Amino acid sequence: MADKSDLNALSGRFRGYYPVVIDVETAGFNAQSDALLEIAAVTLQMNKEGWLLPDETLHFHVEPFEGANLQPEALAFNGIDPTNPLRGAVSEHDALHAIFKAVRKGIKDKGCNRAIIVAHNANFDHSFVMAAAERASLKRNPFHPFATFDTAALSGLVLGQTVLAKACLAAGIPFDSSQAHSALYDTLQTAKLFCELVNRWKKLGGWPLPTAESE
C-alpha cells in the first residue's frame, strides 16, 4: 500500500483522493430526466519523481434508460444517434459497474481513500454519473458525493481560459475540434490538461508545500 506521507505518491498529493477524469455525452442538461449516451474515464498515476500522468482508459456508449428524454438540440450538438446499432451501447448499470470496479481497484492499489471526479465543468458530469448510479442501484459508488476537481476553474486561474479547446491550446496541448464532443476524446484531452496544470504548479515550486524546516 502506498505511503500517504510520500508527497511523490498519488495518495499523498490530493489528501488521499484518487482523481479520475470523466466526460459524459448526454441527450440534455437534466441528469434526472435526460439520457446518458456516452461516458469515458481516465485514471491517473504518479511517477517516482511525482509527476502526474494518465493511466488507464475506459469508454462506453450507453443505452438511454427507459423513459429518458432525448432532446433533439443535444443530439444535433453531439452528433449521437441513440438508435444506431453500431454504437454497441451497454446499459447504464454495465457501464458504471465496470468503471466503478476499475476505480475501486485503483483506490486500493494506490493507497487512496476515495475517488474524486475530475471534469471540465465538473458539476455537469458529476450530476449525470450520480443520477445514473442511483438509477442502476449501484451501492458501492467510489466517488465523493459532491466534491470535484473542475478543470474549467483551474484553467481559468492558471491559463486565463475556461473553454476546453482554448485551455488545451494555451497549455500547449493539441486539440482537434473535429473530435470534440466525443466523450473519449474530451476525457483524454481533459486528463492531459489536468496533469499539465498539476505538474506546472509543481514546476513553479507550489508543491510540495514549504515546511518550517525548509524555511
UniProtKB/Swiss-Prot annotation:
Enzyme Commission identifier(s): 3.1.13.-
Keyword terms of this UniProt record: Exonuclease, Hydrolase, Magnesium, Metal-binding, Nuclease, tRNA processing
Positions with a binding annotation for Mg(2+) 1: 23
Subunit structure: Homodimer.
General function of this protein: Trims short 3' overhangs of a variety of RNA species, leaving a one or two nucleotide 3' overhang. Responsible for the end-turnover of tRNA: specifically removes the terminal AMP residue from uncharged tRNA (tRNA-C-C-A). Also appears to be involved in tRNA biosynthesis.
PANTHER family recorded: DNA POLYMERASE III SUBUNIT EPSILON, RIBONUCLEASE T
Protein name: Ribonuclease T
Organism: Yersinia pseudotuberculosis serotype I (strain IP32953)
